[in-house]
Amino acid sequence: MDALVSLCKRRGFLFQSSEIYGGVQGFWDYGPLGVELKRNLKDAWWHDMISGHNELVSPAGAPSTFEMVGLDCTIIMHPQVWKCSGHYDLFHDHMVDCRESKKRYRFDQVRGRFVEYQGTKIFVSTLAEIEQEEDEVRRRGMKFFKLRPKNADELTVEKESLTLDKLDSTDNVLAPDAKTLGTLTEPREFNLMFKTTLGALGGEEDTTFLRPETAQGIFVNFKNVVDSSRVRIPFGIGQVGKSFRNEITPRNFTFRSREFEQMEIEFFCHPNQSQEWYRYWRDRRMAWYTKLGLSNESLIMREHHTEELAHYSVGTADIEYAFPFLPEGEYGELEGIAHRGDFDLRSHMEGKLDPATNPMTVELNEHGKPKHRGSGKDLAYRDDITNEKFVPHVIEPSAGADRAALAFLCEAYTEDEAPDENGKMQTRTVMKLDPRLAPIKAAVFPLVKKDGMPEVAQEIYGALKEHYNVFYDAKGAVGRRYRRQDEAGTPYCITVDGDSLTDKTVTIRDRDTLEQTRVKIDDVVSEIQSRMKAST
């Protein structure tokens, strides 16, 4: 993982936000290559899920035909939205504070191991990455027991890595930044929404929140979309946009950030068909990731147990990826596909529903009134053919664009061997990104900067630039230019050499196979287009 992080900074995929001032934890900036990768990822999602969907044909596995439309909602919404959605009361993580270091940690994210010395057993916790965890636990354990290096074998470190929430007690826990045991407080709830203030006065009535998810903007616009676009159930509304969560301990590169981008669909269907649609979207979303290059061996589909379900969920399945910073055998969430039932639309009609009731009813305050009053608007749907009126059920495929980009970067990072310009095999680093996701689709090189080669190369570059993001490079040995493009994930490199001036052909080199083929100059654009089309 360290090698990938280093490459991402060195080649301009990702930078720590505000790095010249020491950075801000949980915030990341996308560099020139990273912004293209992420844009390509979002474009692929939007095309495959929304704009490219054919509503006249029923896709394989779908119960029927359906429509898809898009939406772009504001980051700041009426505060009542978050009260009725349940986020105001229920959107929290459990945190612990260290009385000694005064630092705060997320209870279920801090890992560690039990260590034992002369019959005394303690739990040493750490924030180190998984690759360094055992060494860091051993180092801190030796320091706690005041052991010298020559006595290192007297300390036993258990192999099993655990998070704090798996322990019966924290009394014998050495906190990540503490020197003594038992300094952690009992876990308590911490609301993850960022507060902000509207207007100049800044009173309590002016307090609102940065959205923690894009979904609620879709729900409160449900009636607007139905009335304006004439869509009929079943249909979906897609949205891509920024969300914000005040994570207690952001970590693992961009995996857990405080500002992130979501790609979400809220799919509205008849309650009687909701389970069929849930299965359809679960399977379709899994297939999307493998089609773009994530291996089946690195992905799992995990159904949530009842006790894991969010307050709004009837059922949820997570698509999870084996990120390299996680312990072997563990997976991190890429996307959740949730069966939200009618929770959201009813909550925004009637008021916040109580998930503890079955069937769910509006949660009341001590005076017997709705705790958080809904809009009072009728968000039920009337079928103009059957005249049936009902509150639609919702299936929500919710993907993180940043986590997906990170997964594709992890999957793409490869070290193999390739010949240099002298034919000697050398280790190369290559990002084997799917051509649809690659930041640069092709690079154009003149072999040397003379004899008319730059002019031909520039003409090819200009023709390709009308269709794709391409790169022109005339500096250095051609082997080093290949290596630079391999690290950028560029699938095709086009070289203009001495023969190009006589036979009017160029060499196209494939990033993954290293195969080089001669193609007529006039056919270069169509050849690249053909190869790009074959990858879709």
Curated annotation (Swiss-Prot):
Pfam families: HGTP_anticodon, tRNA-synt_2b
Residues given in the record as substrate binding sites: 106, 213, 260-264, 396-400
Gene Ontology CC terms: cytoplasm
Molecular-function annotations in GO: ATP binding; glycine-tRNA ligase activity; protein dimerization activity
Catalytic activity annotation: tRNA(Gly) + glycine + ATP = glycyl-tRNA(Gly) + AMP + diphosphate
Binding-site residues, ATP: 245-247, 255-260, 333-334, 400-403
Presence of the UniProt keyword Ligase in the record: yes
Keyword Aminoacyl-tRNA synthetase assigned: yes
Segments traversing the membrane: none
Annotated disulfide bonds: none
Main localization (coarse): cytoplasm
Biological process terms in GO annotation: glycyl-tRNA aminoacylation
UniProt xrefs under InterPro entries: aa-tRNA-synt_IIb, aa-tRNA-synth_II, aa-tRNA-synth_II/BPL/LPL, Anticodon-bd, Anticodon-bd_dom_sf, Gly-tRNA_synthase/POLG2, Gly_tRNA_ligase_bac, GlyRS-like_core
EC number, UniProt record: 6.1.1.14
PANTHER family in the record: DNA POLYMERASE SUBUNIT GAMMA-2, MITOCHONDRIAL (PTHR10745:SF8), GLYCYL-TRNA SYNTHETASE/DNA POLYMERASE SUBUNIT GAMMA-2 (PTHR10745)
Stated family: Belongs to the class-II aminoacyl-tRNA synthetase family.
Main function: Catalyzes the attachment of glycine to tRNA(Gly).
Quaternary structure (record): Homodimer.
Stated name of the protein: Glycine--tRNA ligase
Gene behind the chain: glyQS
